[in-house]
Design a protein with these regions (language model features):
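The feature captures the beta-strand-to-loop junction immediately N-terminal to the Walker
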Residues: 38-40
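Conserved ABC ATPase signature
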Residues: 148-152, 156
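Helix-to-loop junction immediately C-terminal to a conserved catalytic motif
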Residues: 53
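ABC ATPase "signature
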Residues: 233-234
Length: 258
């Protein structure tokens, strides 16, 4: 791990039975950078995201995280309570299905406020004001603060999940197909929102997507996966404009001819 990286992984390997999900995968992420992980279904993208975030343990290899004080931590050697605390503070996770991250029986404001309370906030007025501000930032009308998420559209649910995740200003966010399943017009609005907020807050992010256009719009760097391996990595525009690996060439070509 180099001196200034925020997150590094070396030699990540994991199989599900006889099927290799990850094969000797190396990853580096720098502060404030967005890394897109792309590839077709079954390439290992989401498995890699889950291993990097400590949700799934690899069979070999290690993931290292540098905390705000500059100390290195082996993610998979952390005690479970420490890892849970990290996910409530320095880290965030945005799921493809926002219902995995939201509490559907709790109001929109309560969903945002809970993450603040997990960090020790106790003043109701301050929590509500911050929730109102974050609803505004994700373009949800303040009048909806006391509404339950089940009354929200798919795009609104995803924006509420983003507000809940970013309200604590995490240093690192993991995103698993955040625009998947949304209408094209809703996707465009959400992508613009993600790009704006991540840049303004200087958040580092690992973004899993099957959509090369999403990667090009959002990511500084890209990692292309095929059958559990990272076959090509580099600056996003460089890789997509001049792909070197045959699989990357095929992915780019399929988009151009779609």
């Amino acid at each position: 791990m180099t001196e200034d990286t925020l997150l590094s992984a070396r030699g990540l390997t994991l199989s599900f039975g006889a099927i290799p999900a990850l094969v000797e995968v190396d990853v580096d992420l720098w502060p404030g950078e967005m890394l897109a992980v792309v590839g077709e279904s079954g390439s290992g993208k989401t498995t890699l995201l889950n291993v990097l975030s400590g949700r799934v343990a690899p069979q070999s290899g290690a993931v290292w995280y540098r905390d705000p004080a500059g100390r290195l931590h082996d993610v998979h050697a952390m005690p479970a309570p420490v890892l849970r605390s990290l996910h409530r503070s320095d880290w965030g996770f945005v799921h493809q299905d926002p219902k995995q991250n939201l509490r559907m029986a709790v109001t929109a404001g309560g969903n945002v406020g809970e993450r603040l309370m997990a960090q020790g906030a106790r003043h109701y007025g301050d929590i509500r004001n911050q929730a109102l501000e974050w609803l505004r930032q994700v373009e949800i009308d303040a009048d909806r603060i006391d509404d339950l998420p089940r009354t929200f559209s798919g795009g609104m649910l995803q924006r509420l999940q983003i507000a809940r995740t970013l309200v604590t200003h995490p240093r690192l966010v993991f995103m698993d197909e955040p625009t998947g399943g949304l209408d094209v017009s809703v996707q465009a609005r959400l992508l613009d929102l993600i790009r704006t907020l991540v840049a303004r807050l200087s958040i580092a992010a690992v973004l899993v997507t099957h959509d090369i256009a999403v990667a090009r719009l959002l990511a500084h760097r890209i990692a292309v996966m095929q059958r559990g391996r990272v076959v090509e990595t580099g600056l996003t525009d460089q890789v997509l404009d001049d792909p070197q690996h045959p699989y990357t060439q095929l992915l780019v070509s399929s988009v151009l001819h779609a």
